[in-house]
Amino acid sequence: MAKRDYYEILGVSKTAEEREIKKAYKRLAMKYHPDRNQGDKEAEAKFKEIKEAYEVLTDAQKRAAYDQYGHAAFEQGGMGGGFNGGADFSDIFGDVFGDIFGGGRGRQRAARGADLRYNMDLTLEEAVRGVTKEIRIPTLEECDVCHGSGAKAGTQPQTCPTCHGSGQVQMRQGFFAVQQTCPHCQGRGTLIKDPCHKCHGHGRVEKSKTLSVKIPAGVDTGDRIRLAGEGEAGEHGAPAGDLYVQVQVKQHPIFEREGNNLYCEVPINFAMAALGGEIEVPTLDGRVMLKVPSETQTGKLFRMRGKGVKSVRGGAQGDLLCRVVVETPVGLSEKQKQLLKDLQESFGGPTGEKNSPRSKSFFDGVKKFFDDLTR
C-alpha cells in the first residue's frame, strides 16, 4: 500500500514552520498514543505513522530530501552521492532542474514575522461612536543588542562553509544534479559562530508591548482592523508581521443590532394602546418622545429615521425601530377589576365584533372547524 504524504498525516501545509509541525504532532500523538488506546491496533499504526512523519519533517536535511524526492528519498539507493557547495554545476543545470524540482540558486530569505490576533470586546456605544483603546500584547521583538542579526556585539554572521553563502547544496545522482536548501545554514547562507547573549542567536526576544488602537465608528462583530508591522518581528531583520484586532460587540440590555439598524421593545399599557398617546423611548443620542396612535396592536413597529448606526464605510445612517408590546395589567384592585368587567360588558363580551374584530374572526373560525368535524 502506498505511503501517505507526511504533511497530510500531520494536517499541515508544505510551508508550515517547525512550531506548527510540533503543535500538530503533539495534538495527534496525544490522541493516538498506545497508552490511551490499549489494544487498538489501528490507533497504534496511526501513532507510528504520525511519529515517522514528525521525525522527517522536523529534521531540516530529511525534510529537504523528502520535499525533493518524496518517500523515495529514504528507500535504499534513493539518494546517491553527497552534498556539494560549489556553484559551477548549478550554472549549467540549475535553470532546468531548479525549476523542475523546486530548487533555485537564490538564498532563502529570512522568514517574515508571524501575524498576531487580538480579540477586543466593545460595548454597543463604543462600537457605534468609535473609541481609542490601549491593548497589551505578548510578542517577539527585534533584539536591541544585536539589532536582529543574532550575532554577538562586535561580530558578524559568517558565510556558511557548506554552501559558500548560496543557501543551496547540490544532490548528485549519476549524471543529474538537483538543488536543495542547505541543511547546515537552513538556506540563510550564513552561520552565527558567537551568538548574541540576549537572544541566543535568534535575533528576537519575547516582550510585551502596549499599543493604542483607534476603533472607527460603526464597527460590528466580525470586523477586523489591521495594524501593519505590529505583529512579531521577522527573523534576522526580515519584515515584521501584522496585528489583526478582531471586534466582538457585547450584548446590550435594551438594543439589538441588525446591520446599521437598531431594534428595541417598548412596553405600553392597554389603555394607551387603545386611546393613543406619547411615551418616552431611549436612543443612543438620548431620550425622545414616540407618538403612539390609537388602536395600536402589539408587535407594531415604529421607525425613527437616522437614530441607528452610521455605516463604518461612511454615508448611510441606520434607523431605530421600536416594537410595541401591549402589556396585560397585573395587581389590579377590586375597583379596577370591576371597571374592566364593566368595560368588557360594554364590548358585548370577550368576542365583541365591533371592538375586537380579530377575536370575532378567530372564534368564528373555531366554531366552523368544530361544525365541520361533526358533519
Swiss-Prot record:
InterPro entries: DnaJ, DnaJ_C, DnaJ_domain, DnaJ_domain_CS, HSP40/DnaJ_pept-bd, HSP_DnaJ_Cys-rich_dom, HSP_DnaJ_Cys-rich_dom_sf, J_dom_sf. Its main location: cytoplasm. It is found in: Cytoplasm. One of its GO terms (molecular function) is ATP binding. The keyword Glycosyltransferase does not apply. Binds 2 Zn(2+) ions per monomer. Zn(2+) 2 binds at C160, C163, C182, C185. SUPFAM superfamilies: Chaperone J-domain (SSF46565), DnaJ/Hsp40 cysteine-rich domain (SSF57938), HSP40/DnaJ peptide-binding domain (SSF49493). Its cofactor is Zn(2+). GO terms for biological process: chaperone cofactor-dependent protein refolding; DNA replication; protein refolding; response to heat. Zn(2+) 1 binds at C143, C146, C196, C199. Pfam families: DnaJ (PF00226), DnaJ_C (PF01556), DnaJ_CXXCXGXG (PF00684). Residues 5-70 form the J domain. GO terms for cellular component: cytoplasm. Induction: By heat shock. The keyword Zinc applies. Keywords: Chaperone, Cytoplasm, DNA replication, Metal-binding, Repeat, Stress response, Zinc, Zinc-finger. CXXCXGXG motif repeats lie at residues 143-150, 160-167, 182-189, 196-203. A zinc finger (CR-type) spans 130-208. HAMAP family: DnaJ. Belongs to the DnaJ family. The J domain is necessary and sufficient to stimulate DnaK ATPase activity. Zinc center 1 plays an important role in the autonomous, DnaK-independent chaperone activity of DnaJ. Zinc center 2 is essential for interaction with DnaK and for DnaJ activity. Homodimer. Participates actively in the response to hyperosmotic and heat shock by preventing the aggregation of stress-denatured proteins and by disaggregating proteins, also in an autonomous, DnaK-independent fashion. Unfolded proteins bind initially to DnaJ; upon interaction with the DnaJ-bound protein, DnaK hydrolyzes its bound ATP, resulting in the formation of a stable complex. GrpE releases ADP from DnaK; ATP binding to DnaK triggers the release of the substrate protein, thus completing the reaction cycle. This is Chaperone protein DnaJ. The gene is dnaJ.
